[in-house]
Each structure stands twice: as structure tokens, then as C-alpha cells.
């Protein structure tokens, strides 16, 4: 079962993950965090989130590996929004079949807008989450 306003933040930068969690918590979301893809798969097994905010470069299991494994196990059970500093963020998001992307650095209100747009929907959406 998908928890509608539950966001899973998959980010190895602890400070950034804490900041995103604080912003989303203040906006009324339930936030769980994982520092790599393997930990994220464990969080998903506990409870399917309404949205996965996914960093691409992480130790242990990176974003590509996580997305591939998540989709093999769960299909499109929760939307994935790629969060990356890569210039080709949209291409990277499309490569893994993500529902959107958010480019680093981002404005804090953009995180809330993306969560509002995608959390709880659980279905594929438009590729451009930057202007939610």
C-alpha cells in the first residue's frame, strides 16, 4: 500500500537529506531517508512511499541500480524524481524511466512543489518536475 504523503529521500549527503526532510516535514509530508540504494530498497519493503526523491551518485547502490531493481520488483508503484547536479538531468531521468527530475542546486520551494505534484499519485507523469 502506498502512503500518499510519504516521501522517501534517497541521498548520501546527510546535510542535504536532513534539509529536504525538514522542508517536507514542515509542508506536511512524512519523510523517510536512505543514504544509498540498498537502504532505500529496505525502506520501500517496509512501506511503499508516495514519492521517491532519488540522488543518482551514491555509494553501495547508485540511483541507476536502485531504479532498475525497484522497477523490477515493484513496477511503477511509486513515482521517482531524480535529484541530480548533472547538466543532463532530464536525460538521466528519462534513461531510468523516472517521472521527473529536480536539478541541484534547487530552491527549497521547488522540493515542496515536486512533492505536492507527485506524492500519492503513484502513476507515471510528465518528465519535467522542475516547474511543478
Label each residue range with its predicted role.
Residues 33-51:
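Acidic, metal-coordinating helix/loop segments flanking the phosphotransfer/catalytic sites
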Residues 65, 86-102, 113, 117:
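Alpha4 helix (beta4-alpha4-beta5 surface) of REC/receiver domains from two-component response regulators
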Residues 1-8, 109-132:
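Non-catalytic signal-transmission and effector/linker regions of two-component phosphorelay proteins
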Residues 58:
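Receiver (REC) domain active-site loop signature in two-component systems and cognate sites
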Residues 55:
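Active-site residues of response regulator receiver
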Residues 11, 84:
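Conserved acidic carboxylate
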Residues 36-39, 62-66:
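Acidic catalytic/metal-coordinating carboxylates
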Residues 18-26:
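Charged docking surfaces used in two-component/phosphorelay signaling
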Amino acid at each position: 500500500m502506498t502512503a500518499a504523503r510519504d516521501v522517501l529521500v534517497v541521498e548520501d549527503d546527510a546535510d542535504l537529506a536532513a534539509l529536504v526532510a525538514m522542508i517536507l516535514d514542515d509542508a506536511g509530508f512524512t519523510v523517510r531517508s536512505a543514504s544509498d540504494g540498498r537502504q532505500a530498497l529496505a525502506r520501500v519493503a517496509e512501506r511503499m512511499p508516495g514519492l521517491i526523491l532519488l540522488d543518482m551518485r551514491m555509494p553501495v547502490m547508485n540511483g541507476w541500480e536502485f531504479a532498475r531493481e525497484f522497477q523490477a520488483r515493484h513496477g511503477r508503484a511509486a513515482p521517482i524524481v531524480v535529484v541530480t547536479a548533472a547538466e543532463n538531468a532530464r536525460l538521466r531521468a528519462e534513461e531510468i524511466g523516472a517521472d521527473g527530475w529536480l536539478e541541484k542546486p534547487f530552491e527549497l520551494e521547488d522540493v515542496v512543489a515536486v512533492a505536492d505534484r507527485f506524492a500519492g499519485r503513484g502513476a507515471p507523469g510528465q518528465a519535467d518536475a522542475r516547474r511543478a
